[in-house]
């Protein structure tokens, strides 16, 4: 596990290395996405690796879809991690042999304590959501629009400005959650408690 944390830290080193700039890159292609949601203060438009320097809208939309999806997953992960750290557990047993939810440790240690059938159920549940529910709806209002006529929460009642504001908030909170869950995992491996 320490190797995984070390590898992720080593890989993140590239985020701080200067990106090579092509002499042929024009200002027009570099600024193709400067007015997109997410290109906001304090960084503005930021693409240090030049992933969409060619101005390809389809590629940008795919990367945005992945960013939103991972942000949503990480927001749930941070909430779940903090809930467990606060000592909140489901009542009862996790299996028929008497393993209680209370006996399952927090964080990475839970992977070895949860029965194999439980891990299989988690993977099947995630797979079902990936295939059936959390897919980008073709022709949706925006990239990452997972509305499927089951859950709406009144989205259509908002004004266009309010929708843009809420999408920007979600994007920023998703970015923060991606950094947050990584920080929580690193703190766990370092043996540092996150709660007083």
Curated annotation (Swiss-Prot):
What are the GO cellular component annotations?
Answer: chloroplast thylakoid membrane; light-harvesting complex; photosystem II
Its localization reads: Plastid, Chloroplast thylakoid membrane
Q: Which is a Pfam family this sequence falls into?
A: Chloroa_b-bind
A molecular function (GO) term: chlorophyll binding
Q: How does it sit in the membrane?
A: Multi-pass membrane protein
The stretch annotated as transit peptide is 1-31
Q: Which residues cross the membrane?
A: 73-94, 114-134, 174-196
Q: Which GO terms describe its biological process?
A: photosynthesis, light harvesting
Q: Which Gene3D superfamilies match?
A: Chlorophyll a/b binding protein domain (1.10.3460.10)
- What are the UniProt keywords, alphabetically? Chlorophyll, Chloroplast, Chromophore, Light-harvesting polypeptide, Membrane, Photosynthesis, Photosystem II, Plastid, Thylakoid, Transit peptide, Transmembrane, Transmembrane helix
Origin superkingdom:
Eukaryota
PANTHER family hit by this protein:
CHLOROPHYLL A/B BINDING PROTEIN (PTHR21649)
Oligomeric state and interaction partners are given as: The LHC complex of chromophytic algae is composed of fucoxanthin, chlorophyll A and C bound non-covalently by fucoxanthin chlorophyll proteins (FCPs). The ratio of the pigments in LHC; fucoxanthin: chlorophyll C: chlorophyll A; (0.6-1): (0.1-0.3): (1).
The UniProt function text for this chain reads: The light-harvesting complex (LHC) functions as a light receptor, it captures and delivers excitation energy to photosystems with which it is closely associated. Energy is transferred from the carotenoid and chlorophyll C (or B) to chlorophyll A and the photosynthetic reaction centers where it is used to synthesize ATP and reducing power.
Indicate the family of this protein.
Belongs to the fucoxanthin chlorophyll protein family.
- Kindly provide the name given to this protein in its UniProt entry: Fucoxanthin-chlorophyll a-c binding protein A, chloroplastic
Q: What is the organism field in this record?
A: Phaeodactylum tricornutum (Diatom)
């Amino acid at each position: 596990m320490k190797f995984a944390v070390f590898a992720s830290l080593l890989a993140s080193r590239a985020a701080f290395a200067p990106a090579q700039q092509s002499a042929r890159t024009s200002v027009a292609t570099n600024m193709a996405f400067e007015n997109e949601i997410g290109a906001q203060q304090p960084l503005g438009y930021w693409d240090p690796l030049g992933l969409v320097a060619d101005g390809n809208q389809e590629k940008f939309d795919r990367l945005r879809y992945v960013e939103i999806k991972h942000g949503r997953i990480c927001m749930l992960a941070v909430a779940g991690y903090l809930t467990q750290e606060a000592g909140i557990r489901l009542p009862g047993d996790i299996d028929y042999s008497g393993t209680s939810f209370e006996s399952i440790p927090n964080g990475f240690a839970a992977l070895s304590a949860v029965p194999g059938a439980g891990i299989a159920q988690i993977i099947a549940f995630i797979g079902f959501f990936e295939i059936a529910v959390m897919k980008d709806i073709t022709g949706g209002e925006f990239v990452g629009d997972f509305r499927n006529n089951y859950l709406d929460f009144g989205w259509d009642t908002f004004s266009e400005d309010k929708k843009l504001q809420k999408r920007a908030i979600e994007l920023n909170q998703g970015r923060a959650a991606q950094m947050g869950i990584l920080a929580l995992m690193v703190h766990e491996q370092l043996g540092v408690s996150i709660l007083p």
